[in-house]
């Protein structure tokens, strides 16, 4: 949980939605950027266009990345990625994505934020960083196996895991929301009542929404 100053009625609905992300997706996206050591001027690739991937774009920009490459195939998510700070987008997958990103970045990105967890996404993430890059992996692994030869020969470091939420990122992200620097609440693209919670989960599973917002009461 993240303690917010004041009372709920002190804030707009949009601000409350942004606060809500600090206990989950925004903290996870920031964790990816932090463990990948994203620095001012860096080129960053973000694997994933869900709420965590979009939050990772916000985090990369917040940490000063100069170029941020999103990887979306969906117009609404690509547009939101651009609004959050993505400068480019690659819709291709697999070897085509690797080839395009390496060409765009003159040999690879400084950091790669893997926010999906599938074998294909992880494999791509290991191949699109420059030699010596860091992959920040926060996508929940769908497969226990991972090719370690590629990162070994490219001197690529891999770091990540569950976000801390209440340690190094808590005050930084809360201040960024309060100051209006970031607006991660935009990942909530549809509101549901508590009675509709099953529909809310299904809508995310069917990719009809980016993130469902369940409003318990008025």
Language model: regions and residue ranges:
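NAD(P)H dinucleotide-binding glycine-rich loop of Rossmann-like/cofactor-binding domains
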Residues: 1-47
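ADP-ribose/adenylate-binding Rossmann-like module
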Residues: 129-144, 158-159
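Glycine-rich helix-loop-beta junction characteristic of Rossmann-like nucleotide cofactor-binding loops
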Residues: 34-39, 104-106, 127
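C-terminal hydrophobic helical "lid"/dimerization subdomain
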Residues: 107, 119, 123-127, 167-218
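Adenosine-nucleotide cofactor-binding segment
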Residues: 46-49, 61-124
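Hydrophobic/small residue at the entry helix of a nucleotide-binding pocket
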Residues: 28, 52, 77
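Rossmann-fold NAD(P)-binding glycine/threonine-rich loop
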Residues: 139-154, 170-173
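Residues in the short beta-alpha loop(s) of Rossmann-like NAD(P)-binding domains
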Residues: 73-74, 141, 164
């Amino acid at each position: 949980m993240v303690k917010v100053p004041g009372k709920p009625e002190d804030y707009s609905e949009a601000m409350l939605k942004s606060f809500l992300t600090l206990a989950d997706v925004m903290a996870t996206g920031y964790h990816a950027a932090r463990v990948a050591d994203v620095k001012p001027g860096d080129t960053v690739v973000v694997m994933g266009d869900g709420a965590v991937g979009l939050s990772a774009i916000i985090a990369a920009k917040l940490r000063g990345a100069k170029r941020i490459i999103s990887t979306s195939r969906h117009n609404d998510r690509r547009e939101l990625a651009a609004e959050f700070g993505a400068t480019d987008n690659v819709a291709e997958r697999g070897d085509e994505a690797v080839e395009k990103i390496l060409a765009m970045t003159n040999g690879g990105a400084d950091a790669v934020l893997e926010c999906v967890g599938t074998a294909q996404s992880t494999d791509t993430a290991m191949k699109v960083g420059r030699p010596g890059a860091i992959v920040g992996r926060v996508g929940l692994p769908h497969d226990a196996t991972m090719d370690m030869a590629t990162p070994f020969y490219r001197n690529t470091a891999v770091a990540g895991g569950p976000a801390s939420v209440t340690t190094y990122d808590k005050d930084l992200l809360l201040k960024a929301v309060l100051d209006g620097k970031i607006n991660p609440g935009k990942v909530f693209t549809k509101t549901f009542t508590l009675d509709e919670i099953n529909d809310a989960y299904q809508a995310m599973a069917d990719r009809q929404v980016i993130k469902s917002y369940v409003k318990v009461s008025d």
